[in-house]
Amino acid sequence: MDVSVIMEGYPIKPVSVVTLEGYLSQNYKITDESGDIFIFKYYQNSREFRRIKAENDLMHFLSTQMPIDISRPAHPKMIQYPDGSFSRMLTYLPGDFLKDVNYSAELAFNFGEIIAQLHGSLTNYRDTEIEAYDHKWNLLNCLDSLNDVHYILDPTRRKIVSYFLDQYELFSQEILRTLPKQVLHNDLNDWNVLVADNKIRGIIDFGDICYAPKVCDLAIALAYLLLDKENPIDVTQSLAKGYATMQRLSEKEIKLLYNLIAVRLCISVISSSKARSTTSSSDYVFVTEKQAWDLLDKWLTINPIRFENCLRPTFSYPEIAPNTEVSLLRKKYLSAALSLSYSVPIHMTSSAFQYMYASDGNTYLDAYNNIPHVGHCHPEIAKVASRQLRSLNTNTRYLYDALTEYSEKLLGHFTVDLSKVFYVNSGSEAADLAIRVAQHYTQRKHLLVLKDGYHGNTRMGIDISSYKFDGKSGTGPPSHVTPLPLPKEYRGTQPSGKAYALEAIQIIEELWQDGIQPAAFICEPISGCGGQVPLADGYLQNLCPYLKSKDILYISDEVQVGFGRVGSHFWGYEMFDVQPDMVVLGKPMGNGHPIGGLVTRDDIADAFHNGMEFFSSFGGNPVSMKIASTVLEIIANEGLQNNALITGRYFDNLAKKLAIKYPQIGDVRNRGLFLGLELIDPTSFEPATTYASIIKNKLKNKCILTSTDGPYDNVLKLKPPLCFSNQNVDQFFEAFEVILEKTMI
């Protein structure tokens, strides 16, 4: 296009024409004979004429109101051409882009002042064309972007955007729509703000003006100002203090900012991802994409309450205080038998993926809770649960697709021999049912378990859990239960897994000689309550053939170990190349939704069909099935099993290096993201129970959640959500090493 031809209507003789980036118009930097500089903008879409005229009018108005330069028309009229296209000439503003200058708190403060003056100037400005202009960059329309989320091809990225849009829809949308509206610039990003001498000197590009609550303008300005900033809270406070010199924010507006900032970033990365699917997109579309993703990652680490509290005092509101009554009310209404983690318990208010947010504003890295297997509050699970609850929730006495669809998916992760599944509401119920089925199938009662094992909170679960009957207030094993030694390599009693298996076989033989024929042997592939102890290699390989020869059923309790947590395999028993007769499922199966399952062989399931109907009121309901199905999809789509393997190896490498430096780390246990660090007295080699408790609580004080386990409660255990990253591992070890350095045993 010959720019000089379409510029003939303007009293300017260009001597230099430089093409600029743009996505709604063709933009040029023009220098005339006298050295004056202008911005020439050419529009091909004739339907934009009235809106651009309204934009010109607004810029002219602001140029008379603001103490800084405003990009404005350099020629009183826009020129329209015979084909309907049109152009305009704007003033050129000198200065550096905000993105290119060194950040300072003083500059952020001044930016806040300028935004406040801008809002003050526009409080009563009305223009029907602007008010009618509806577009995707108006944050009131942010949920329209959900239609384009699929353009984000990486599911681990897409979930973050879906999460924040979901949070906005649930907790912010309704409040935002009740706020008064006014004309806004709506794109105060760091490319549209000019700086000179550490002061804001100009604002350009009014192409996204809209009619919306003023807090949207602040959210957009902050979304870009916070890019690449080490401490977003400090930057936000500096800008807010400047804004507060001339404008106030209501408590509602302050509460909205956290989600609105995230939403603007989400719209930006969605737009970039969509643009990437076309070959004609300008590089301008991608200019802040990586920074926006980085800030979204960082945003997850910021507690919404902390962010709100960083603003409230600036606008003369008290900080949100933790609810001090919740602990007293818990004691009043609940039994003390329900224990709390940590010497000073945490009052949690919300969560996201591997982060949990407390009422005091702290964000906790969750390295402990294995139930939210694919992450806390995963938006896909929330969405499918909500949709199914609005459609059908019944029981297994009726036919419905969700039951069979999930069963097919689940059983696809087992060998063909394991082809039937029973659904219940928890791992405890599943273990209980497994024993009931085993005793019926074998017509035997006696059971074999492992020392320090745990299999649930039912009466039967306690009977078969050495962790309980050999623990505090325990009365030892019932007469129909025989505990076998836990086959552990560290501080073990046998030299190998095979030796442990031979020892177990000897114990069973003695039972047999006494006329006691066991029905089943139940164990976890990794003993959680035993101290995160992987069964010694060779144990199951040598024991299982013997069990089969005696028609003793082998039950693998995968409640904590299964669904890809060990990384190398989907189920824990697969690590040992053995085949169980039954598999107990629970905890991660529904990512926090109560669901459990028992998988077994056809002949065992058929034998249980003896006229005494099995029925679980809620087991296998459509909501549970849809949620569980989504968990499997997320594990596959987000590559979480592989992430468990890679992140677990990274953890193991750092842990073993640290153990060389700190001998109180007696043993490092790692199978994927099933992790344990046994803490000992380095002199006596005795379990360091008190020390482990101190370490756990000090990690909590550094906002990292772990726990302790094992018969001596001296094993620091970590079983985080499978989205746990290498960066999270680094965060853990940075805190852990500082604590080890300062905490003498």
Task: Specify the residue positions occupied by each region the protein language model found.
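An alpha-helical support segment within catalytic cores of ATP-dependent transferases
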Residues: 2-7, 126-127, 143-186, 325-331
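ATP-binding glycine-rich phosphate-binding loop
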Residues: 10-28
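Active-site acidic catalytic loop and adjacent metal/ATP-binding pocket
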Residues: 24-32, 39-40, 169-216
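A conserved alpha-helical element in kinase catalytic cores
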Residues: 42-83, 101-102, 106-109
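A cross-family kinase active-site recognition segment
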Residues: 101-156, 179-181, 445-474
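Active-site activation/catalytic loop segments of kinase-like enzymes and analogous catalytic loops
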Residues: 215-248, 262-280
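ATP/Mg2+ or Mg2+-diphosphate-binding catalytic cores
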Residues: 268-326
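Conserved N-terminal phosphate-binding loop of PLP-dependent enzymes in the Aspartate aminotransferase
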Residues: 315-745
